[in-house]
Amino acid sequence: MGVVLLALPVLLLVAVVAARIYFEHYLHSEAFRKSLGEAAAKSLNADSATFAPLEFDGGTVFGENFQATRGDGGAFSSLDADQLRASFDWHGLLRHTVQIDEMSVQRLNIEPPAAAAVEAHTAQSLSGAGPAAQGPLDGLKKGWTVDLRKAVISEANWQWSDKPGGGITGTALTLIPNGPGAWIIDAQGGTVALAGWPELDLDTASMRWQSPTLFINSAGLRNGASRLTVTGEIETRKAANLQVKFDGVDIRPLLTPDWRERLTGRLTGQANVDAPLGNGNAARQLTVSGSMALTEGVLTALPILDEIGTFTHTERFRRLELTKASADFTKSPDRLEVHNLVVESEGLIRVEGDYTVVNGQIDGNFEVGLTPATLQWIPGSQEVIFTDSHGGYRWTPMRLTGPVAHPHDDLTSRLVAATEKAVIKSVDGVEGTVKKTGQGLLDLLMH
């Protein structure tokens, strides 16, 4: 018995060494690399996943490349990772588990699925068919599993859409598991691009993935002096609901080419973005609603203002510096609705109203207010047109219709008619004394 007791530690040591040798041999085998690829493919819901030959140094493994492909229209069509390095716990191998304490990736590229595949995948999901959604690296129920404790990606490039184009490039990611199917994700740096919008630099983003939804706790973006803060959630292949606060956003890139020469300034406000995902009509169903104010605003070469400037001999109308400009809005791909619009150059003019733009055609109803001092240069205007008085302005309604680039108003014609009538009456001695500019306005109308 004593001999057996003395030999037992030796036998255990031999068994441990033999097991270590066996596992080391197995880890270098093609069978293990294939099993690891199958585990990763299952976790990613991919059709295939392959690792380049792996190199081991104690508890650290190195790999040149990892690739995964997916053709069912899910989260990606291809995933390509370069320069992988992982530290793992040997004890997990006894449980058929690859326990990775930390994995680092130098570069990760993710390409979006084709539009047709996305539509087919969405239809299958809505019908209840197909496999249930999994979080990244949730593991297998049988065979080998992957237990990733932390992932650090130095450079991630993710194209999430090709029609319209959109994605993020050059961002650094840190991912930490936070329960079954859940991950805490921190992002830093990189550039966000979306077709039709200026590029934005990402400062930082704090997010949480809980399959199948990405929760954005906070994301800070900038473009020059522009600053945006984004919160909200994105439910995979269903919908995105985001809240955006913006400050100092240059308005010109958001305008049509004709208006970029007429209006300058910076936007401040907030907006809600609702976007369906996973179908070919998603881009046509996007809606944005919110409120905004324009600071440092300047209106230049607006026809109606030029006309008022001509009538009043006031050059300030030709380059109107705005002391206040604000509105509520709802924007969809084929329609813009603006309510509670207020545009004012204090002591000169104030405009209030609502309008819609559909298929490039504007239809709006406004109230235009001018100061009595300004209107004194327009004979008959206060008696016939600007008849209402409040808030330091004399007011009249105005209708604006036609192409957005060259709209038509009904105020100019009324000003012309009223002024002509007043000047003619003055010449005939009916009206009495009128300011000398009346004759100048008559000359303008006749020539």
Regions found by a protein language model. Give the residues of each.
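Transmembrane beta-strand segments that form the barrel wall of outer-membrane beta-barrel proteins
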Residues: 153-158, 186-190, 213-219, 336-341
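Short extracytoplasmic
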Residues: 38-66
